[in-house]
Amino acid sequence: TGHVQTSLVDFPEKIATLFFFSGCNLRCPYCHNASLFEVPPQEKWLSRDYIISDIQKRLKFIDGVSFSGGETSLYEELIDLVKEIKERFGIDVKIDSNGLKPKFIEKILPYLSYIAIDIKTTPDLYGELGCKLPKKEVEQKLLATKELLEKQANAKVEYRTTMYPKLVESYERLCKMADFIPENAVYYLQRFICDNAYSAEAKAADSYSMEQLERMAMEMRRITKRDKIFVRTYL
């Protein structure tokens, strides 16, 4: 687990303290946090007491706590930790996830103010990300997460896609991905940056320009009849 004491960009409209969880059930070729793929020895973990104590120290300076990864949903104990943070401090909590563990999301949702889901591509290409699940199971899990998030009104919902051209190569694929995005979500297209990418292929790959991404977002809004589709510009 890692820690960024103060973040102005990770939790929209909040000054947040950010904790990273190591370990991930995917191996996205474009990932810039590949150092978090594997779980480190337990002696390197941040303790629950440290996290609670650190948040308490920062309450005068922050108005949010964010948990990212790696993949947060691999840690069932995060549910009780987030519950304690919410009940003890009354502060807003956000998590990032890939949405492949809907049962975890169902349990943690009551304590969240914000959830961000990374939808990578269409389910048939999740094998390219090192996902061991068959396409049908990926579909089922992403749809279950979508339905959970559509039914609740407790947390703001963000979906986002890193626009790696090999995995999102057409409007058709992008619009198919919309089937797995809740109606109440804001959806961001994020520019793929080859620097520090995990795979050699991704390091050498071209990126979409910001102009191309803006056109894609505009076309996706037109085709899907959704208006909350944007390009994230601070990357």
Language model region names:
Residues 3, 190-192, 231-235:
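Conserved beta-strand termini and adjacent loop/short-helix elements that scaffold enzyme active sites
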Residues 1-14:
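Short, charged low-complexity linear segments at domain edges
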Residues 44-54:
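Glycine-rich, highly charged phosphate/nucleotide-binding loops
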Residues 52-64, 73-204, 210:
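Conserved AdoMet/S-adenosylmethionine-binding subsite of the radical SAM
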Residues 11-46:
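Canonical Radical SAM [4Fe-4S] cluster-binding loop centered on the CxxxCxxC motif
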Residues 70:
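Conserved strand-to-loop "acid loop" that flanks and positions the catalytic carboxylate
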Residues 213-235:
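A C-terminal junction/extension of Radical SAM enzymes
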